[in-house]
Structure formats: C-alpha cells, structure tokens
Amino acid sequence: MKITLVKKVLADGSSCRKCIDVMGKLEQSGYIERIDEIVSADEKDPDSPGMKLAREHNVDRAPFFIVQEAGQPSRVYTVYYQFVREEMEP
C-alpha cells in the first residue's frame, strides 16, 4: 500500500491552516511514519505535483490522501478522520 498526502501551498507561499492542523495530528499520532509521500499543491503553479493529482482525482480541497494498492482503484480521502478510521486504525 502507498499513501500520498497532498498539502496546499497558498499563493503567498504559506501552508493552508487545515494542512498545518492535519500535519500536527499525523505527527502527534505517529501516523506520519506511514505516509509514503507528501506533495504540494501550489496555488501559483497549476503544474505542481499536488495540483496534477487534484485534477486527476477530481479533488478541489486540501489536504487530501490517496491510498493505492496493487490491482485496486485508488481511494481518496478529503476528511482526515475518515482516512484515519478506514486506513490507519483497522
């Protein structure tokens, strides 16, 4: 399983407030160690890796998680607690 976290970078270069909050929760819980990749969706760069992933998965908010397993469709989570409940805790 591969887990990707997409964080938003605002036009002024700062991280979005919700992204900072989710990163704190991931670090505090220890779940950050299970995240394989963290990419940025830069508002100033529509070709940034995170913006491309957002378009590919039809997501219009950040942060979001993409969970990939071989032979299965990707699962996308835009709600932190749902992601934790369904992917981290089972």
What feature does the model see in each segment?
Residues 21-23, 53-56, 77:
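Generic alpha-helical propensity signal that fires on short helical segments
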